[in-house]
Amino acid sequence: MKHELAGEKIKKELYYAVREIGKEKIQKDISSCIQSSREYIDLLMNKSIDRLISTDQSLDYDRVIGTLSEALLHFMLTISTLPSERKIRLNSELVIDVVIPNLRNLKTNPSKSIIVQFIKQGPELNNVSKLEFIQPNHENIWIVFYRPLSDVK
């Protein structure tokens, strides 16, 4: 299955789970109690993964988790009305997945900006060090990977 096709399938399953619960309910609950976001993240991830794995055993689990995590972050940022920019191509080798609040702010005030990078395959870890050139504050570079980075050789 092509990566784009798998990505669309993953997003479709996520938004199916969102509709089951109710987008407005999720938004209202998170607005009134930010701690509920953790419960919704767990619930949406589990519902989506269960449906994806049960319908297609050939999916690459690493890529499924990475793509699902990224789609879920986009959803959570949107319902929380937090400003962000997505899929910013810096050059032919480096694409930033998410910048909060935006690239302009990252360039002028990196201490007030966060980069979120989703690693869907091990070789993508090689690009992490390149992010440090645009975001000098290491604690403001968040890496999302399906397993602990200490496990990666």
Question: Residue locations for each model-derived region?
Answer:
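Interdomain/boundary linker segments immediately adjacent to catalytic/signaling cores
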Residues: 1-71
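A short acidic/basic microdomain associated with nuclease active sites
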Residues: 63, 74-98
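Short, surface-exposed basic-aromatic patches at helix termini and helix-loop junctions that form
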Residues: 78, 102-104, 132-137
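Beta-hairpin (beta-strand-turn-beta-strand) motif
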Residues: 89, 101-103, 148
